[in-house]
Swiss-Prot record:
SUPFAM superfamilies: Cyclophilin-like. The lineage of its organism: Eukaryota, Metazoa, Echinodermata, Eleutherozoa, Echinozoa. GO terms for cellular component: cytoplasm. Signal peptide: none annotated. It is an enzyme of class 5 (isomerase). This is Peptidyl-prolyl cis-trans isomerase. It comes from Hemicentrotus pulcherrimus (Sea urchin). Binds cyclosporin A (CsA). CsA mediates some of its effects via an inhibitory action on PPIase. PPIases accelerate the folding of proteins. It catalyzes the cis-trans isomerization of proline imidic peptide bonds in oligopeptides. InterPro entries: Cyclophilin-like_dom_sf, Cyclophilin-type_PPIase, Cyclophilin-type_PPIase_CS, Cyclophilin-type_PPIase_dom.
Amino acid sequence: MAKPQVFFDLQANGENLGRIVMELRADVVPKTAENFRALCTGEKGFGYKGSTFHRVIPGFMCQGGDFTRHNGTGGKSIYGEKFADENFTLKHTQPGILSMANAGVNTNGSQFFICTAVTSWLDGKHVVFGAVTQGLDIIKKVESYGSDSGKTSKKITIADCGQL
């Protein structure tokens, strides 16, 4: 099975930061990868375009994907509100890992995070479904606008996104 490539064009307070490219592991977690891919393209009538990274903690991760409430309490999947944890085969082994944010077991929606460090304590709790393949320097830039509380000093927006 193919591993789809998707992208985010990121901005900080309206200033272009650049593009990150991510490879989705549809070969391991097809349902989770398809959800993220379709939210990147917006083909279901909703998705990530125009949404923000609402929580950025340096040395940990950058979280986004709440395109309904924009504060970390919302979002929805292409399957309805929430969907089950597909599997925990892939691990949080390096910076750039793409994983699902959740509110407990089987509560995946649209929120995701990009690791900026090894986060092995999340293994078995969050579904890893891909990794950044280009633009880790852009993620480092985003990380620099974060804080220990997760509040960002600049508004980090997904200005455009899609599939390559």
